[in-house]
Regions:
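N-terminal secretory signal peptides that target proteins for export/translocation
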Residues: 1-4
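Aromatic- and Gly/Pro-enriched helix-to-coil junctions and flexible linker segments
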Residues: 22-191, 199, 203-207, 275-281
Length: 499
């Protein structure tokens, strides 16, 4: 393929108009300045007096809430029947209006109006849905005609698998934690997968199964689970079955409580080889605070078809700092910055902010020339560590040389309900009382040909050159003919390959 080169200066590209609507509250790095999202029903053509549970609210709850808020679903209350929901109506209005900050429900914290808004498995509420909920509660939360109710969702008897039954389930060892006691860190061993052939993984979902009754009246995530997080790898077992063969190991996305499944798009996939095992090498367990609990992690793998080979090379997240950070006590709006220059064309698959208890917000930017493109800003709640997987047509396509900039916002004041003590300085560390500032998201490296193909597909989706795709800010950049220097470089490269 002939070399192509884009203009280094982006002055010819128009920056997108600011998408932040006047109706949205301004977000910063302080908890004290958090404001709810409040909407008028009339702005969405909604007659506030006609909003009822049966006709309007039940469908919203089915889509975005009942996977957890149902009998056996893991949440502290059921939100299925009207008599269950009515008593929580004011609380539902309050928690949904928080929207993208700690404490919000449902826990999907992408800030609207800023950057890319197309994500897989997005169960967040729209502006219109928030307006509907607020109108319903303000009007007395009427039930309406039960004939308007949608058909009930048939949920599984247990907490089930979010993505459906896996092709392979690998069970970790049972671990027991006392009702009250110190946290436990460490390696909990190897778990063979039982695979007899190499398979590429389409998705992996990790869930905790424990002996806490599903109907227990628990109001915190930490009271229901004992595994806070798990770092694990895979590889081929050695002949003795006592370890992994050197050179065959690879790391998997970290499991964290409240985290959604990892989905690897077509063209990617992670290899789980024959005669392999999972190495559960870094587990963090804690007491629930109210009962002795025995639990284990189950790893649910779904595979691409046999014979599948990935097209792309996997890369990691966008960087950050988990060691050398200085978090000051009793101060809101603290900012931490990390920069990384891309050495390859890159497609970002998922953005996953990882902070600790003081964390409030993280933003992801791409810097090209003199221009800065805010790809996303996402709120953070250490009780619900989430990854945000881009829809394929919206995933950021970044040329090599792009500077990827992440900004973390921390608040160590008493306004932050996740903070144990506002008085102490804290540095980096693995415990929740220490701090991290990392993007754990996923990306892939692209060849020049793959990059050009991806951009051509994105351009084909646009109506004309006035359309704008912030995830592909190079899509409409004019190409220029290769220079003599480019030709010389190609010649030298070809000679090197032939030697």
């Amino acid at each position: 393929m002939s070399a192509r080169r884009f203009l280094g200066s982006m002055a010819i590209l128009l920056l997108p108009p600011t998408a932040l609507s006047a109706q949205y509250p301004v977000r910063d790095g302080t908890v004290a300045n958090m404001e709810p999202y409040v909407f008028a029903a009339a702005d969405f053509g909604i007659d506030a007096s006609s909003v009822t549970f049966s006709k309007d609210i039940a469908p919203i709850l089915q889509r975005s809430c009942q996977s957890c808020h149902r009998e056996g679903g893991g949440a502290p209350m059921s939100l299925v029947a009207y008599n269950e929901v009515r008593r929580w109506a004011p609380r539902i209005k309050e928690r949904t209006a928080i929207r993208d900050r700690m404490g919000a429900m449902p826990p999907f914290f992408v800030e609207p109006g800023i950057g890319i808004q197309d994500f897989k498995n997005d169960y967040s509420l729209s502006d219109g849905e928030l307006a509907t909920i607020q109108a319903w509660v303000d009007n007395g939360a009427p039930e309406g005609d039960r004939a308007d109710l949608p058909p009930a969702v048939e949920w599984p008897d247990d907490r089930g698998w979010v993505l459906g039954e896996p092709d392979l389930v690998v069970q970790g060892p049972d671990m027991t934690m006392p009702a009250v006691g110190p946290d436990r860190w460490g390696d909990i061993g190897l778990v063979p997968t039982g695979l007899t052939q190499d398979r590429y993984v389409m998705s992996v979902e990790v869930r905790e199964v424990n002996d806490i009754p599903t109907d227990a009246d628990i109001t915190t995530v930490g009271g229901r689970y004992i595994f806070h997080h798990m770092t694990y790898t895979s590889g081929q077992l050695n002949d003795e079955g006592s370890g992994l063969v050197e050179g065959t190991t690879q790391g998997w996305p970290i499991h964290e409580v409240g985290r959604n499944p990892d989905i690897f798009p077509e063209g990617l996939g992670m290899l789980l080889p024959a005669n392999s095992a999972l190495s559960l090498r870094a587990s963090h367990l804690h007491s629930t605070g109210w009962r002795e609990t025995t639990g284990r992690l189950e790893f649910g793998f779904r595979f691409f078809p046999e014979g599948y080979e990935p097209e792309y090379r996997r890369a990691g997240g966008s960087g950050g700092n988990g060691i050398d950070i200085d978090v000051r006590p009793n101060e809101g709006g603290q900012e931490f910055h990390s920069y990384r220059v891309l050495e390859d064309h890159t497609k970002i698959i998922a953005f996953e902010p990882h902070l600790h208890a003081p964390g409030v917000r993280m933003c992801l930017e791409a810097i090209w020339g003199t221009n800065r493109f805010t790809l996303n800003c996402v709120g953070y709640d250490h009780n619900w560590v989430k990854q945000y997987i881009y829809e394929d047509h919206a995933a950021p396509l970044l040329p090599k040389g792009t500077i990827v900039h992440i900004v973390g916002f921390l608040d160590t004041t008493a306004e932050n309900p996740n903070l144990a003590d506002t008085r102490n300085w804290a540095g980096g560390g693995r415990r929740s009382v220490a701090n991290m500032f990392i993007d754990l998201g996923q990306s892939v490296r692209l060849t020049e040909e793959q990059f050009q193909t991806e951009m051509a597909e994105r351009r084909a989706r646009m109506k004309d050159r006035n359309a704008y795709d912030i995830g592909c800010f190079m899509c409409w950049a004019p190409e220029i003919a290769p220079t003599a220097a480019d030709a010389d470089a190609q010649t030298q490269a070809a000679r090197g390959q032939n030697q």
